[in-house]
């Protein structure tokens, strides 16, 4: 999984959500959200994390960072924003390979309780909407990821195919 090189983790595991989980449920103290959109579709991607998990994940990639509590929190949020940005960029590249041009906004940090205000109601009319949640586990703990997808032009996404991208040396996580 290419995400391992962004996180510094040896192995990441995709695990099922708890059986009592409901989309829109608050699962962590913080979340980073980013909007990926184009004329055909929109994806609202969120990575939910607690400070301890985010900090543990950040320290795997950058072990020599300072330990001042306020600075650690800021660095952790910055790291999680960049991780969300990298994942979203990867999603945009996959859609670009399928001739769908999507752009993305700047990642936004919010408190996890704002998840309560998200409407994950599925619709199957002219505008197709659905939500999905998954959990990624590693030696840092776990992250919950949620996505809410709105498809405005269903015909444009019926041909989508995913092929694994070739690994290159320049896929390293960069903080600008």
Regions found by a protein language model. Give the residues of each.
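Composition-driven recognition of glycine/serine/threonine/acidic- and proline-rich low-complexity segments
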Residues: 1-176
């Amino acid at each position: 999984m290419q995400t391992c090189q962004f996180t510094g983790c040896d192995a990441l595991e995709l695990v099922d959500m708890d059986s009592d989980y409901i989309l829109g449920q608050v699962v962590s103290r913080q979340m980073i959200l980013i909007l990926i959109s184009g004329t055909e579709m929109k994806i609202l991607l969120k990575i939910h994390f607690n400070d301890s998990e985010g900090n543990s994940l950040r320290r795997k990639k950058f072990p020599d960072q300072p330990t001042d509590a306020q600075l650690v929190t800021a660095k952790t949020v910055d790291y999680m924003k960049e991780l969300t940005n990298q994942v979203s960029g990867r999603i945009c590249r996959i859609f670009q390979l399928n001739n769908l041009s999507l752009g993305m906004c700047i990642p936004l940090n919010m408190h996890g309780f704002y998840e309560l205000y998200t409407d994950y109601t599925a619709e199957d009319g002219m505008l197709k909407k659905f939500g999905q949640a998954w959990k990624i586990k590693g030696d840092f703990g776990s992250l919950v990821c949620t996505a809410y997808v709105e498809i405005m032009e269903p015909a444009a996404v019926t041909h989508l195919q995913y092929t694994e991208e070739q690994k290159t040396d320049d896929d390293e996580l960069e903080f600008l």
